Each structure stands twice: as structure tokens, then as C-alpha cells.
Amino acid sequence: MRLTPHEQERLLISYAAELARRRRSRGLLLNHPEAIAIITDHLLEGARDGRTVAELMVSGREVLGRDDVMDGVPEMIPDVQVEATFPDGTKLVTVHHPIG
């Protein structure tokens, strides 16, 4: 299987998010990279599903709460920006204060 660098990056994000979800389901608090992976994966998959940028900007804030992450992680992530592929092209999705 040959993957472009872009496809490799998406695969890495997807796997990191899946690993973080498994850890979260075991009751572990997520660290910074795990939180970013889950939020990023949510945005990429939402775009793939045909959701709008506005919808993702709102739903991206509902993926994780303070109870899901280690102390200090919400303050380390003031925003998440992802270039996602939508049915009508690539767009930048920005989620401000993604962990409420």
C-alpha cells in the first residue's frame, strides 16, 4: 500500500485518536497529544461526513470536557486548527477553547 505524506498524516491522527479513545474508556485522563488527536479526528471525520465548518466549530467544543483530561491540558490548548477536506474542497476549521 502506497500512501502520500498527507494520507500518512491522516492515518497517524486516526490511530492516535483511537488509542486515546481506548485509554479514555479505561478511565484514564488524556494528555495534550491525546486530546489534540481526538479533537482533530472528530473534525476530519465530520468534514468527510459532509458537516459544515460552522457545525464542526460548535461540535468540536463538545468532544472533550475538563473531566476527560489531565490538569492543565485545557489551558495548553487555546484553539485547534485543522485543514479538512469537505465535499466542496479543503477548508480551515478553527475551534476556540475546545475543552470546556
Swiss-Prot record:
Keywords: Cytoplasm, Hydrolase. GO terms for molecular function: nickel cation binding; urease activity. Disulfide bonds: none annotated. GO terms for biological process: urea catabolic process. It catalyses: urea + 2 H2O + H(+) = hydrogencarbonate + 2 NH4(+). CDD domains: Urease_gamma (cd00390). GO terms for cellular component: cytoplasm. Pathway: Nitrogen metabolism; urea degradation; CO(2) and NH(3) from urea (urease route): step 1/1. It is found in: Cytoplasm. Pfam families: Urease_gamma. InterPro entries: Urease_gamma, Urease_gamma/gamma-beta_su, Urease_gamma_sf, Urease_subunit. Its EC number is 3.5.1.5. The keyword Hydrolase applies. Heterotrimer of UreA (gamma), UreB (beta) and UreC (alpha) subunits. Three heterotrimers associate to form the active enzyme. Belongs to the urease gamma subunit family. HAMAP family: Urease_gamma. This is Urease subunit gamma. The gene is ureA.
